Amino acid sequence: LALGQAIIESGWGQSRFALEGNALYGQWTTNEQRGLIPEERDDDKTHAVLKFDSLKKSVQAYMHNINTHGAYYSFRVVRRIAERVQYTDPISAKVKFLAAYAEIGDEYVDKLELIIESNKLRDFDRFEY
């Protein structure tokens, strides 16, 4: 799931935000000093995309966001239930609750499901190191 989101948000690591700011997940900030201003940002918008000193810090910030922000509360509840009942495809159960992650909402969910499926990212679901 996290790999799929990084692929989408960073354009396979090739976006300006990934290359200049180690930003894999497109997280927003209202502090322009801490981020990169999107080139095509609407005039009425004030956000920037958070930049990081390392890819590791980008991943850590994403994990903190997904595990604490109120917008992803339902995602966390479903994740907990899927783990307890050992749901056979926990990614499918969880991904539906990530529409709030992107401005495009349900289209983002569809895109994420396609990326996960077409790149066999489920193979990494139980990865241990």
Predicted regions mapped to residue ranges:
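Catalytic cores of secreted/periplasmic lytic hydrolases that degrade extracellular macromolecules
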Residues: 1-3, 8-129
